[in-house]
Amino acid sequence: SIAVSSAPIPTLDLLNLPRPKSSSPWAYVKIAEGCDRNCGFCAIPSFRGPQRSRDISSILDEVEQLEAQEIVLVAQDLASYGKDRPTELGAGSIVPLVRAVSATAAWTRLLYLYPSDLSDELIDAICDTGVPYFDLSLQHVSKPLLRRMRRWGDGERFLRRITDIRHREPSAAFRSNFIVGYPG
């Protein structure tokens, strides 16, 4: 006969695995996994599930342990960080985390921002990091096509926001990605 244990199966928290000190002057820090959006072209929610933000203290502990000069915060939807943790510091806003990381690291960079969630407060926090770098997932500028993609915003709104950022910080750098030939 086969003995089956009744002990609970341990869970593996892949977002909070300990990491060694960075051997590079930069380090990527994953602050959340998954996504709550249902863009028409994206499969991330189907295989990574809903957004799960890491606890701010575990992120700050990792940043300190890595001892990197530049910290690159990464998630599928950075601006939604914390919305799934409503009782924590700065609930529903990534701004307190950006400010806390910036107080520790010489430079802080954010990858993958949804342009419709780019608040004035977040723009100011990014400009204060030492790296005024805006990685905006624009995808397209046509409002009707963006609606078919199940995304919000439009080219005019995006350009106004970029112009506003340029007025605040003339040295700001931008990166984006665009989908051409969207079949939807």
Language-model segments: residues:
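Conserved SAM/AdoMet-binding glycine-rich loop
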Residues: 68-183
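Proteins enriched for Cys/Gly/acidic motifs involved in redox and nucleic-acid/cofactor modification
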Residues: 1-82, 124, 130, 155-167
